[in-house]
Every structure is written in C-alpha cells, then in structure tokens.
Amino acid sequence: DPSIRGREVPKETTGPRNLPTPALVLNVYSRVSSTNQKVDPEPNHLAREMDRFNRTRTGLDHLWLTERDTRLLDPRQRKVGERWHAPLYLARRIARFHLVDNVRGEPDHYGQKDVAKAQLELEVLSRNEGVVEIQIEGSFRMTKSGPYPTRFDGRLDGRLVYNTQSRKWIRFDLLAQGISTGRGRYTPGAPDGTFELTVAFEIPPDDFAVKIPPQGMRHRDQYLTP
C-alpha cells in the first residue's frame, strides 16, 4: 500500500503475510566474530559461558529476492568493467532486516529512520562462455534508539556468478563485517561495549530454505519496500 510507505507500519497491517514467490533465496548466517569483553576466569561463571555461546553459535535467517530484484541485478547487458548500483530499496532491505545480531534469539529490526547509510555497487569482472562474474561491495550504518539501542557500522563485499544461458545465479556470496553495539528485546547476553559482527549470505545447498520466509516478512510491506 503506497500510503504506508515512508513510515512505520502499524501492527494491524502486518499480517497475514500474503507471501510472494521468491525468485532467489539466500541463507543468512550471523556470528559474533570478536569481542573485547573481559570475563571472570571461573569456568562456571555465567558471563564466561555467555561469551563462549556468543563465539560459537550462529544465527540463521533467509533473504528473499523477488523477480523484480533479480531483474534489476541482471548482468546480461553489462560489459566487463561496467559498474552500477543495486536498487536502494534492496540495499535497505538487507540493512534493516538482515544485518542484525540474531545469534541469541529474534532481533529487533532497524526502522526506516534508523538507516543512515545503505549502498551496494556491482562491477562485471569477466564474461566467459555465458558465465558472468561480478564483484559487489558496499557500506552500511544503522543506529536504533529507544529502550534497546543498537548500532551496526561496516562494509559488505562479495562475488556473484550468473549463467546467461540458464538465466540463473549460480553463486551469490556476500560478507558483511563491522562494529556493533547493544542488544535487542529478545537477544539478551550481547557482549558489553562494542563487538565485531559478521553476516554471511549464500545460495542454500538445498530447497529447504525456499519454504521458510524471512523473519522480516512478518512486516511484508516494509520488507519488500523498505
């Protein structure tokens, strides 16, 4: 509904989801990759156990790309060395709903006004017998205030491979890394102070992920047009 774009979607407009059929699904993994937190050396100390949990557990979600999304990324008419920007709404979808710390539970997603920067740029690296290799890079910065303030600031890099004959993406590897702070309402136990957060994206090895909507899809309109 165009009337709700540009502001938060009221709760009564968030369901049922009326899910679209995704053209491409990516697995999304999150991991607390480094912390500066000092913990008690006592093995049974709760902080020590939580620190171990943060360092060894991985959050999982799924990024859905629609037919429109993949069409705007289509490199078939692009030349080697050509650069272009991914649509802003797609960069914002990734920033708001997927660049989050969901290692310990369901995260609070960033709001529309929380995204200070979200941009992605692509470049064709090579074309060989119908296979196009693409580099993607970008940057992001989100800050959420309120009772559970969080922040994530960093860069995203990756490699994409597209088969022009089958018209399918055969590789879609992205890696976002940056500095994060804070915890969500349902993600207690985040490291104190700042910590490094890593979020990785890839095409799943099977079709199981296709059946599982992204957590952010509970806010369908915001997810598709953030």
Task: Mark where each language-model region is.
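Acidic, serine/threonine-rich low-complexity disordered tracts
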Residues: 6-226
